[in-house]
Regions:
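Core dinuclear metal-dependent hydrolase active-site scaffold
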Residues: 24-62, 66, 94-160, 220-228
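A short helix->loop->beta-strand "cap" motif at the edges of active sites that frequently abuts
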Residues: 48, 84-90, 188-191, 213-214
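Bacterial N-terminal signal peptides
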Residues: 8-17
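Sec/Tat signal peptide C-region and signal peptidase I cleavage site
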Residues: 19-23
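Di-metal (Zn2+ and/or Mg2+/Mn2+) metal-binding site signature of metallo-dependent hydrolases
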Residues: 56-95
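Bacterial N-terminal signal peptides that target proteins for export
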Residues: 1-8
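Structural motif
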Residues: 68, 142-144, 166, 193
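Cap/insert and terminal regions of metallo-dependent hydrolase folds
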Residues: 150-228
Length: 228
């Protein structure tokens, strides 16, 4: 599996001078809003705003600095919901992040974004999907699996000491709960969070509680947490 480091995003952001959104309730802290289903919003300590797989829930009002999309299914690609974008805002999808078998890493001035393996099941071609490992200032890491089943690369991620990892567990289009638990134990993040639990629902408390791992963190849809 090949990797390429791309500096284009970083250069364009620096030249165009992206604006910032103040982190609500805590400037100087990284904050993450789980919007529901497979959608996340991160506000960095510097006030930069990152959206991952926009589609579900609320909280699309903050101007974006970066939009990440794991694959092409409609419940992950509603980028038009993000109407406000700072100058130089980039949209990075699986198409830019996985080219001829090479998983890209993008170095920005406020984060490093690494594409990793995803898909690997009958509903998601591994050649057309990525997960994202986002490294923020201070070394804080967030891993969003995207729609996936077990991948070979998850064993490598165990060596990265990931801080927060989101695991799909719907068992219909992706891995089921037992497989998600096994993947979470393999990656062994400091905090393992179930998401993308039931198609058509933002969140399911009963299913979230079935995600039985020692380092489980349940984050209901619409809840914002401080990454620490």
């Amino acid at each position: 599996m090949k990797r390429t480091v791309c500096g284009i995003l970083s250069l364009s952001l620096l030249l165009l001078g992206c604006g910032s959104a103040l982190a609500e309730g805590g400037q100087g802290e990284h904050r993450l809003l789980y919007q529901g289903h497979g959608s996340l919003r991160i506000v960095t300590a510097e006030g930069k705003v990152i959206y991952v797989d926009p589609y579900a829930g609320e909280g699309y009002d903050l101007p974006a600095d970066l939009i990440l999309v794991t694959h092409g299914h409609q419940d992950h690609t509603a980028v038009k919901k993000i109407k406000n974008r700072n100058d130089g805002c980039q949209v990075s999808t699986w198409k830019e992040a996985l080219v001829k078998g090479e998983y890209k890493t993008f170095d920005l001035d406020f984060a490093t974004v690494e594409a990793v393996q995803a898909g690997n099941n009958r509903n998601h071609n591994i050649k057309e999907c990525v997960g994202w490992v986002i490294t923020l200032s201070g070394g804080m890491t967030v891993y969003a699996t995207g729609d996936t089943s077990t991948t070979e690369q998850m064993a490598e991620l165990a060596e990265r000491n990931i801080d927060y990892a989101f695991f799909v567990c719907d068992g219909i289009y992706n891995m089921d709960m037992d497989e998600a638990i096994a993947c979470a134990k393999l990656v062994n993040a400091k905090h393992s969070i179930p998401y993308h639990m039931v198609p058509g629902k933002l969140f399911d408390q009963k299913r979230a509680e079935q995600f039985d791992v020692p380092n489980r963190l349940i984050v209901p849809a619409g809840e914002e947490i401080v990454l620490e």
